[in-house]
Amino acid sequence: IPSSLVGSEMCIRDRSKNPVFEVKAVGSYKQKPGCPEFGLTKDESLRLEKICGGECFNPSDERRNITRIEVIKITPQNFNNEPVDDLIQDVWKVFKCKPSQDGCKIRFSDRDFQKNGRDSVYYVRAIEEPSLRVNGDNLRCDYDENGNCIKVNICHGSYLTDKRDDCVTSSEERAWSSPIYVNQI
């Protein structure tokens, strides 16, 4: 499916063919420490330091790796009150990616599309390698032996949280595609 169709609708006229998708995702740029040289006066530099704490948008030429691409498939209801539990497949397919500065490229098909005889909507999620994020785990749970959250440790960003707590945790950033609507004719 051409990238121009992302976020739009298409119809499959040839009932003998299933849709084939190609996806490419690249990671975000890794951040360099500090701020770039802006050619600021001493007063401007001090103000920038006070406001930003010495950290600015300062991307390097190196990208984070995409670790996997997940595909979500949604089949619209055919009638009112049709149960949706089996119509939303999150996650439908998962593709592991090799570390590469060039990103990750996958190709897949919905082999059951024609057989099922129903319209479908597809999204993809590109998942980056873990990186540190402020409030990347906003509840910061303590878990019991069964994996249930038994206590939250919220980072409030106020006097309610110790000022030495920077609230930084590891998180897998993700990017979503626009939907692709594929209709039966």
List each model region and its residues.
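Single conserved hydrophobic/aromatic residue that forms the stacking wall/gate
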Residues: 1-7, 12
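Structural beta-strand segments of beta-rich domains
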Residues: 17-21
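Short amphipathic, basic-aromatic surface patches that mediate peripheral association
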Residues: 24-62
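Divalent metal-coordination and catalytic microenvironments
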Residues: 71, 124, 177
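Exposed aromatic-hydrophobic patches
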Residues: 101-114
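Short, aromatic- and glycine-rich surface loops/edge beta-strands on solvent-exposed regions
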Residues: 118-130
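Short acidic/polar inter-strand loop motif in beta-rich domains
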Residues: 127-140
